[in-house]
Structures are given as structure tokens and as C-alpha cells.
UniProtKB/Swiss-Prot annotation:
Membrane-spanning parts: none
Disulphide connectivity of cysteines: C25-C52, C32-C46, C36-C53
Gene from which this protein is expressed: DEFB123
Listed name of the protein: Beta-defensin 123
Tissues expressed in: Abundant expression in the male reproductive tract only. Abundant expressed in testis and the caput region of epididymis, but low in the corpus region.
Family as reported in the entry's similarity comment: Belongs to the beta-defensin family.
Example of a GO biological process term: defense response to Gram-negative bacterium
Function: Has antibacterial activity.
Species annotation: Homo sapiens (Human)
Amino acid sequence: MKLLLLTLTVLLLLSQLTPGGTQRCWNLYGKCRYRCSKKERVYVYCINNKMCCVKPKYQPKERWWPF
């Protein structure tokens, strides 16, 4: 019974403490954050003034247009 009460308490606390998740950007390939991880790059900025951190494989390739 004590184990059940402890488990329910922990689950209740975890459901209250965990955020809903980060806002998604760049066609759901990026995440809006204040700092990007080492494997991510900033490509655009989100509406909430955070950086849209996108992994390099999901960013468009740069094309050089001849003039």
C-alpha cells in the first residue's frame, strides 16, 4: 500500500513539474530555444524571440546563383 501511495505521489509530481514541451519551428524539424546544442545551428528566429535550433541535415543547401 505504501508503495502504491509513493508511486502515485511521484507520478503526480512529475506531471506537474514537466513542461508541455518546446515550441516547434522550421516545419517541425527545429525547436525554439535560448541556446542551441553543439550539433544544431540557428537558421531563423522564432516568434517568441528564441532561436530556432535546427540540425544541419534539415537545413536547406546553399545554392550559388550565377549572375
